[in-house]
Amino acid sequence: PLRHFPLSIPVIASNDARSKTLFDNAYGTGQSCWTTILDIIDPAKIGAPIPGMKIGVIGYGDVGKGCARFGRALGGRISVVELDPVRALQARMDGFTVASLSEIAARAGMLISATGEPSTIPLNALEALPENAIVTVAGGVAGEVEFEQALAAGWTLSEAADPHVQRLASPTGKSLRLLEKGEGIN
């Protein structure tokens, strides 16, 4: 759309550059997301409980790959949800467990959406997560976490001590930690 307007200076769309998607998305975004996650869940820098934690990464595009790699480097037990069979195979070849969202959500201490698509973490995944699990979005679009649907289903959202963490409580009393109200943390 902007191509139809004359510009007085040259403009480059860096977000479309291969060097952006192949390097910044795959490495920089994964690293910056984990830096943000750690800053939020361990503000005192006493040691976040990532080693050994079961972590689900939804999506194995460039951002998902980076999130999975850095999560594994931090000691997390990473599983990947990927609908594209070729990307799912790539995740397996990279050494990650690949499973359905329902399987991963049932045992995940953290669930990360890395798809840039709405409704990536639906209400049934929130219901399946264990008590105190962390729910976060690597970046992307509004609505990746269906927390509005959760609120309509009787869940409640309250602020925690940290302004970057909200408590999402189910009607049965289970509480999840939602980072940045389900908006992108990158």
What would you call each of these model-derived segments?
Residues 14, 58, 72-94:
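NAD(P)-binding Rossmann-fold cofactor-contacting core
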Residues 30, 34-37, 42-72, 79:
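Glycine-rich adenosine-cofactor-binding loop
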Residues 23, 27, 31, 61, ...:
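Electropositive phosphate-/nucleotide-binding environments in soluble metabolic enzymes
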Residues 92-178, 184:
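Rossmann-like adenosine-cofactor binding region
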Residues 1-8:
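Phosphate-/polyanion-interacting regions in eukaryotic proteins
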Residues 62-67, 88-89, 118-122:
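Short glycine/serine/threonine-rich phosphate/pyrophosphate-binding segments
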Residues 10-45, 147-186:
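Adenosine-phosphate binding glycine-rich loop
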Residues 16-17, 83-84, 117, 140-141:
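Short, ordered loop/turn segments at secondary-structure junctions
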